[in-house]
Amino acid sequence: MLTLNTRINSADKVSAQLVLPYESRENSRLRTALSSGEEVAIFIPRGTVLRHNDLLMGDDGRVVQIVAARESTYRITCANPHDLLRCAFHLGNRHTQTQVGEGFLRIARDNVLKEMLEGLGATVIEEDAQFEPEAGAYGSGGHHHHGESSQGHAHGPLAPIPVHQKIHRPSDIPSR
């Protein structure tokens, strides 16, 4: 089995392509198969998200190109930028993985979200497309759920507020 464990920026020769849906590209440990049928194991740093055209080098020196699979998605457009921004806000408020394009948003198909977006005035079209959602504010590509600690994994340029630090709001100060 070929083990892919190093991401590289360029290569003179690509030996194979590995087509993966976004959900699989989020996994730092994955066992799968190339289109040739050869089994591969991916072992990359935790929190790494593989993107379309990323290159991974195997333990034997071979290079495999990652290809984003076509997935069932919704393409969201609006009559004006303000309405599209409102849709992006509501999707983000629901922690929905969202791809931001030039004049459109793309999400995985979800009928409840479709109804919400249409209620906001959006045009929602079913589309099979490569799904490349934003990595998130911290750039790690991973996420954690409310109530889980964010300690123990790296973040990008925006640092989280340390757990021991209190954020003071006007309502926190006792009235005198």
From Swiss-Prot:
Signal peptide: none annotated. Its main location: cytoplasm. InterPro entries: UreE, UreE_C_dom, UreE_N, UreE_N_sf. One of its GO terms (biological process) is urea metabolic process. Residues 134-176 are annotated as: Disordered. Keywords: Chaperone, Cytoplasm, Nickel, Nickel insertion. GO terms for molecular function: nickel cation binding; unfolded protein binding. SMART domains: UreE_N. It is found in: Cytoplasm. One of its GO terms (cellular component) is cytoplasm. Gene3D superfamilies: Urease metallochaperone UreE, N-terminal domain, UreE, C-terminal domain. Belongs to the UreE family. Involved in urease metallocenter assembly. Binds nickel. Probably functions as a nickel donor during metallocenter assembly. HAMAP family: UreE. This is Urease accessory protein UreE. It comes from Nitrosospira multiformis (strain ATCC 25196 / NCIMB 11849 / C 71).
